[in-house]
């Protein structure tokens, strides 16, 4: 089984798809990496030679931020936004949508389950 950037690639899938199991690599980046290494995208992961796997590993490690490094960078970017107190940072801190979506209705993913407000009646 090919292990690249700490991720086991699925053996039965094509390399083009298998690489997308690595956080930070999608279809476009996967094709770009395969073009640089000269590996046929239709090759199955199980059919890759050790030389090809080492080529892939080398290119990914040198040129791209993936997995833990990328996650850390994203977390630090969000933390920085929250520290400087900009609009986006305040939205992150409040757990509300950051990119201008409406919040009067919807936004349940960011806001969590509904909190119903009870009405008190006079006795």
Swiss-Prot record:
> Which ranges of the sequence are coiled-coil?
none
UniProt keyword annotations, A-Z: Ribonucleoprotein, Ribosomal protein, RNA-binding, rRNA-binding, tRNA-binding
One Gene Ontology MF term: rRNA binding
**GO:BP terms for this protein?**
translation
User: Which PROSITE patterns has this protein been placed in?
Assistant: RIBOSOMAL_S13_1, RIBOSOMAL_S13_2
Tell me the NCBIfam families matching this sequence: uS13_bact
The record's PANTHER family line, in alphabetical order, gives:
30S RIBOSOMAL PROTEIN S13/40S RIBOSOMAL PROTEIN S18, SMALL RIBOSOMAL SUBUNIT PROTEIN US13M
Provide the function of this protein: Located at the top of the head of the 30S subunit, it contacts several helices of the 16S rRNA. In the 70S ribosome it contacts the 23S rRNA (bridge B1a) and protein L5 of the 50S subunit (bridge B1b), connecting the 2 subunits; these bridges are implicated in subunit movement. Contacts the tRNAs in the A and P-sites.
Query: What family, per the record?
Result: Belongs to the universal ribosomal protein uS13 family.
Q: How does it assemble?
A: Part of the 30S ribosomal subunit. Forms a loose heterodimer with protein S19. Forms two bridges to the 50S subunit in the 70S ribosome.
Q: What is this protein called?
A: Small ribosomal subunit protein uS13
What is the native source organism of this protein?
A: Acetivibrio thermocellus (strain ATCC 27405 / DSM 1237 / JCM 9322 / NBRC 103400 / NCIMB 10682 / NRRL B-4536 / VPI 7372)
User: Quick one: which gene encodes this?
Assistant: rpsM
């Amino acid at each position: 089984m090919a292990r690249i950037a700490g991720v086991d690639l699925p053996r039965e899938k094509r390399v083009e798809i298998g690489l997308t199991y690595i956080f930070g690599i999608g279809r476009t980046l996967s094709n770009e990496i395969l073009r640089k290494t000269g590996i046929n995208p239709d090759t199955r992961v199980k059919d890759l030679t050790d030389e090809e796997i080492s080529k892939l590993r080398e290119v990914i490690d040198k040129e791209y931020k993936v997995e833990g490094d990328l996650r850390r960078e994203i977390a630090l970017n969000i933390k920085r936004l929250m520290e400087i107190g900009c609009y986006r940072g305040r939205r992150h801190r409040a757990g509300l949508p950051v990119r201008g979506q409406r919040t009067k209705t919807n936004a349940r993913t960011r806001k969590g389950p509904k909190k119903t407000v009870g009405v008190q009646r006079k006795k």
